[in-house]
Amino acid sequence: MNNDVFPNKFKAALAAKQVQIGCWSALSNPISTEVLGLAGFDWLVLDGEHAPNDISTFIPQLMALKGSASAPVVRVPTNEPVIIKRLLDIGFYNFLIPFVETKEEAEQAVASTRYPPEGIRGVSVSHRANMFGTVADYFAQSNKNITILVQIESQQGVDNVDAIAATEGVDGIFVGPSDLAAALGHLGNASHPDVQKAIQHIFNRASAHGKPSGILAPVEADARRYLEWGATFVAVGSDLGIFRSATQKLADTFKK
């Protein structure tokens, strides 16, 4: 049986520096995720760090995106090999790794997604990702079709951005603006000049190493500015934010 994930088109688009517009999925529901998948976004983040997701909620969302052109990207709760292994086995190929501060942490993330000898991923011969053992070339194709995006969101991460971006197997650098703002002493104010300067610096250093950069920017003016600065993969909103804003606007229309 053929696996319709290989080759990984999202990974190829990033390597070609093609702009990829995405959206955040935080409602942890297959219906809302399916709606996002019909909208035409290039990629969707299914959030395992701040949203109430786990293996049991991720699988229905992956099923809901089966016919979608939007590439599912999972943000893992932490850079931990067993967690990453389990998410690989259920069918994720694109990973966003939060709070990466050093080259060694970036290398660990890459190794966690690769079978030996390139990495340390544990081997199961039958799981959802290989269609329960029916994809003949899964082991041969898997290592080279995994996308690793590492998230820089601390001063140490900024300081080590060159080493992180140069790490073999890292496909892109993603900025976490809220945590970065907090780390720089500007909690709740990612628009502060110090934070914006750091974001642009990260983009520039990623580009210097031939790596695409990305960010979450639910405000249109911010998203367009980051694209002008050279960001390649930008998430321009979230299902939770869209839902909250639209419902509030509807209520206000009739209640005020």
Curated annotation (Swiss-Prot):
UniProt site positions, description: Increases basicity of active site His: D89
Domain of life: Bacteria
CC cofactor: Mg(2+)
Catalytic activity, EC: 4.1.2.20
Enzyme class: lyase
Magnesium found in the keyword field: yes
Cofactor binding note from Swiss-Prot or TrEMBL: Binds 1 Mg(2+) ion per subunit.
SUPFAM superfamilies registered for this protein in UniProt: Phosphoenolpyruvate/pyruvate domain
Pathway(s) the chain acts in: Carbohydrate acid metabolism; galactarate degradation; D-glycerate from galactarate: step 2/3
Gene Ontology molecular function, alphabetical: 2-dehydro-3-deoxyglucarate aldolase activity; magnesium ion binding
Binding-site residues for substrate, renumbered to this chain: Q151, S178, D179
InterPro entries assigned to the protein according to its UniProt record, in alphabetical order: Aldolase/citrate-lyase_domain, GarL, HpcH-HpaI_aldolase, Pyrv/PenolPyrv_kinase-like_dom, Pyrv_kinase-like_dom_sf
Record: residues binding Mg(2+): E153, D179
Catalytic activity: 5-dehydro-4-deoxy-D-glucarate = 2-hydroxy-3-oxopropanoate + pyruvate; 2-dehydro-3-deoxy-D-glucarate = 2-hydroxy-3-oxopropanoate + pyruvate
Recorded GO CC terms: cytoplasm
Keyword RNA-binding in record: no
Family: Belongs to the HpcH/HpaI aldolase family. KDGluc aldolase subfamily.
Subunit structure: Homohexamer; trimer of dimers.
Full protein name: 5-keto-4-deoxy-D-glucarate aldolase
Species the sequence originates in: Escherichia coli O6:H1 (strain CFT073 / ATCC 700928 / UPEC)
Lineage: Bacteria, Pseudomonadati, Pseudomonadota, Gammaproteobacteria, Enterobacterales
Gene responsible for this protein: garL
